[in-house]
Each structure stands twice: as C-alpha cells, then as structure tokens.
Amino acid sequence: MSFTVKDIYDKFEVILVILDGEEKMDRVIEKPGLSRPTFELFGPFQSDPIKSAVVLGNREYSYLTSLSPEERKEKTKRLLELQPPVLILTKSFLDPVFLKECNKEYKVPILCTDMYSNELNISIGLYISKQLAKYTIHHGVLIEVYGEGVLIIGESGIGKSEVAMEMLRKNFLFVADDAISIARIGDRLIGRPTEINKHFIEVRGIGILNVTKMYGIEKIKSSAHISIVVELINIQNNQPYNFERTGQKTRYKVIENIKVPHYVLPISSGRRSSELIESAVIDLKLKRDWQYNSGDDFVERYYKYMTKEE
C-alpha cells in the first residue's frame, strides 16, 4: 500500500498546517526520512525527481532571500520542477509568499509547522522511516522489559511463549510472538508484530491466546527498539556450550547488520527464566548506561584479595 503525504498530515495534523497544494495530498512518498534541497538550490541542476519529503528551514530561507527576485524565482522553480512529494516549512522559514506564488504552476503540497528542523527529524522523519522501512521476519518473542526491547530466541518448544506469559504477569509489555517483523532504522532495530499475529500468543497445550483480551490493552506495545537478544538453550540435551562465567565480555548477535548484545541462558528445571531475563536486562543497562561491569568488579576484587594474601 502506498504511503502518501496525506498519511503524514493525518498523523501529525496537530502540528501541521496545509499552506498550498491540498488537492495533491495523495502524492506518494517513496524514500524514508526528510531531505534538504542542497544540490537543487545551491548546486548544478538536478534532473531526477525528488522522492522524499523535503524540509525548508533557516538555511534555505536565508539563501533564497539573499538573492534578487529573479534569481529567487529561478531557484525556487528549479526545486518545484523536480516534483517533490511535499515541502515542509519549519518555524525558521519566515515568509512563504514567494514560494506559494511559484507553486501555482506545480501544485506541490506545502505544509508548515511551528517546529524546527531537528524536531521534525525526530518526529516526522522517524515516522516516515518506520513506514517505509524494509521489514524481514524473524522467529522469536518480543517483549519490553524496563524500557528495553528483548528479543527471545531459541529452538521450537523451549518455552519462549511461556516466558513471555510470565513477564506479562510481572507487568512487562508484550509486542509479538512467533513471527517478528524487524527493520533497521538508522542505527536501531525496530521490531513489531505482523498483521496476522498482532496481539496473539501461542502457548503449547492451551493454544492461541489474545493478550489484549486477557491482560488489557495497557500490556500491549505496538513496536519496540530491540536492545538485547536472549537465547534460551536446553542444557538437558547435553549439548556442549561455552557459557559466560564472569560476564566481563559482551557477546553480540548481528541482526540486519547491527550488533545487538546477546545473552545465552541455559534452561533447566528449577530455573526461573523470567527472572534470568530481568537480570540480563539490568546487567545490560548497568554496562551501557553506567559503564559498570559486575564481572570486572569481581575479578578486580579477587586479584586484590589474592595479592594481599601473598
């Protein structure tokens, strides 16, 4: 399904005002993010159509208003001739009158906002990138624990969905089960359910359950930034594996060309998987946000003790 200028306006109607080109709001946006018309205004003529939403801010306004009326008209028409799907004017673009005058021939949708360029990138730019991102399907369960997206993976039947149910009872958030749509957006991984499995989870022996009906809509998250991968391994199969002992070194798993911290947890009777996952998330936050490594702390204390004994 095509992603149009109207989709942006409908999503951000509170902060956007249609200035011109309302009859062309069905124009399709094909490229993610927001672009600035550097070459189109400042450089040699570009002949390729612009396929992304274009932002005009203080830089563009200062340049255009520094030109003579004839040059300003020429440069503005050069941009409009490339038929960008939409122009979004920031708070810094003070006077759009000449832009509207040139646009009579081209009918490019022009939206204005009371926000600055960096604010638009965070809100509208990120929204466009999410909508146009290429998602691939990965097998697992995605939940959010302490604000961190946790992708739980492991062989079929190991208990990933059961762990997710335990986490729900602990008031953590559910994103998706079984088929996870994952896309790279900038340097982040975003995971979400597919249209088919949204809000559903499969628990062996019970069947398909509707998480929203059972626990309430407040336990559902539409998507999550994947911060950590937790892999469950059944050690009862007697498969050799070099498990982490001190936790000094962080393992990583590469998903969509992004390295994600990877914790491998052995599963056996008597071990509460949900509590282990909580501990893994807390350990991640300590290492990443506080630069504290429990393993390093322990080893340092151990060597100090041994040196003292000698």
Swiss-Prot record:
Residues the record lists as binding ATP: 154-161
Organism superkingdom: Bacteria
EC number, as in UniProt: 2.7.11.-, 2.7.4.-
Catalytic residues, chain numbering: 139, 160, 178, 245
Enzyme class, broadest EC rank: transferase
Binding site for Mg(2+): 161, 202
A GO biological-process term: regulation of carbohydrate metabolic process
Similarity annotation: Belongs to the HPrK/P family.
Record-linked PANTHER family: HPR KINASE_PHOSPHORYLASE, PROTEIN YJDM-RELATED
Name of this protein: HPr kinase/phosphorylase
Organism from which the protein derives: Mycoplasmoides gallisepticum (strain R(low / passage 15 / clone 2)) (Mycoplasma gallisepticum)
